[in-house]
């Protein structure tokens, strides 16, 4: 059910860091309520890319996405960028009105840059604000290093795992860093 207080969490895996050269190869979304309770998990989509795009990945992306199995899932996928965008929008429209949720995640500005370039309808669905967990991570590193160090991430670099970790990390900072 649509609620303007719900939060949209998104994570993208890309072939690199430059939205003008690189492309999205996986995306996932989760909708939470304002207390960070998961309401629904959206589609987890490996986006097909031609072999020449995959061959152009740098060493880190080639190793990481190869080891995680994502590269093979991308090869086997039949879902285009436009289809992935449409599936994700159809899911979000069930839970959150357009332009009511900030885009939520870790280092979310990078994901937003790729959405702006490759999935503009999806990027336009979000409010212009960002809820970026990495802001709290950076503040904790400077003001309360023990709080930052006490949260350990799995670093699988798979979209759904990364979102779940971002939500858990924000809960951690809410419980141990932010005085409510």
Curated annotation (Swiss-Prot):
A GO CC term attached to the entry: cytoplasm
Keywords: Cytoplasm, Exonuclease, Hydrolase, Nuclease
Protein name according to UniProt: Oligoribonuclease
One matching Pfam family: RNase_T
Job of this protein: 3'-to-5' exoribonuclease specific for small oligoribonucleotides.
Active site residues of this protein: 128
E.C. number(s) listed in UniProt: 3.1.15.-
Homology family: Belongs to the oligoribonuclease family.
Subcellular location: Cytoplasm
Record has Metal-binding as a keyword: no
Residues in Exonuclease domain copies: 7-170
Entry annotated with the keyword Nuclease: yes
InterPro entries assigned to the protein according to its UniProt record, in alphabetical order: Exonuclease_RNaseT/DNA_pol3 (IPR013520), Oligoribonuclease (IPR022894), RNaseH-like_sf (IPR012337), RNaseH_sf (IPR036397)
Source organism of this protein record: Pseudomonas aeruginosa (strain ATCC 15692 / DSM 22644 / CIP 104116 / JCM 14847 / LMG 12228 / 1C / PRS 101 / PAO1)
GO biological process terms on file: DNA metabolic process
GO molecular function: 3'-5'-RNA exonuclease activity; nucleic acid binding
Protein encoded by which gene: orn
């Amino acid at each position: 059910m649509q609620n303007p207080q719900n939060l949209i969490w998104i994570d993208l895996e890309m072939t690199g860091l430059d939205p003008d050269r690189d492309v999205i190869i996986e995306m996932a979304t989760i909708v939470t309520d304002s207390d960070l309770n998961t309401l629904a998990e959206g589609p987890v989509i490996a986006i097909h890319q031609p072999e020449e795009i995959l061959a152009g990945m740098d060493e880190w992306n080639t190793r990481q996405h190869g080891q995680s199995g994502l590269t093979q899932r991308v090869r086997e996928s039949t879902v285009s960028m436009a289809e992935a965008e449409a599936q994700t929008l159809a899911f979000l429209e069930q839970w959150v009105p357009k332009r009511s949720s900030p885009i939520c995640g870790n280092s979310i500005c990078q994901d937003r840059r790729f959405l702006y370039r490759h999935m503009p309808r999806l990027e336009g669905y979000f409010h212009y604000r960002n809820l970026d967990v990495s802001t709290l991570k950076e503040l904790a590193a400077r003001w309360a290093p023990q709080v930052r160090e006490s949260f350990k991430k799995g670093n699988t670099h798979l979209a759904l795992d990364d979102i779940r970790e971002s939500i858990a990390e924000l809960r951690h900072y809410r419980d141990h860093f932010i005085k409510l």
